[in-house]
Curated annotation (Swiss-Prot):
Record InterPro entries: Ribosomal_uS7, Ribosomal_uS7_bac/org-type, Ribosomal_uS7_CS, Ribosomal_uS7_dom, Ribosomal_uS7_dom_sf
Family: Belongs to the universal ribosomal protein uS7 family.
Keyword set includes Ribonucleoprotein: yes
GO molecular function: rRNA binding; structural constituent of ribosome; tRNA binding
Protein name per Swiss-Prot or TrEMBL: Small ribosomal subunit protein uS7
Classification lineage: Bacteria, Thermotogati, Thermotogota, Thermotogae, Thermotogales
PANTHER family listed in its UniProt record: RIBOSOMAL PROTEIN S7
Amino acid sequence: MRRRRAEVRKVPPDPIYNDVLVSKLINRVMWDGKKSIAQKIVYKAMEYLSEKTKKDPLEALHQAIDNVRPLVEVRPRRVGGATYQVPIEVEEPRKTSLALRWIVEAARSKKGRPMAEKLGEELVNAFNNTGTAIKKKEDVHRMAEANRAFAHFRW
């Protein structure tokens, strides 16, 4: 176990939109430290998003990510030989990172098109409350609801 709590690092905002959330999305898309490629992908996806939603790209991105953010999740807890899936509220920073992770995973799981297009499509779906990332959120919520009986095991 750690001696003290891990320090939360501040992510600098991205150069074009001057927004921390866009910067986090870029870092999530990035592979092998190739940030400039990740930036191109995200900025093209943002253009695609604003084109499809007819809204400001930043506003649309924030809305899409808010739609995917989970409220509760389940965590395993061992109680006397049995492992229970205990529903727990998700902390604020984790909500955002889970939403970003699910959106990028959903985009990567699609085949046959450029990543910018797939990410843009997934962001549009998230904005409209449809798509794979929203389905993932609903699955997590359903799992928490099914295990609500074990909520008293919270720590």
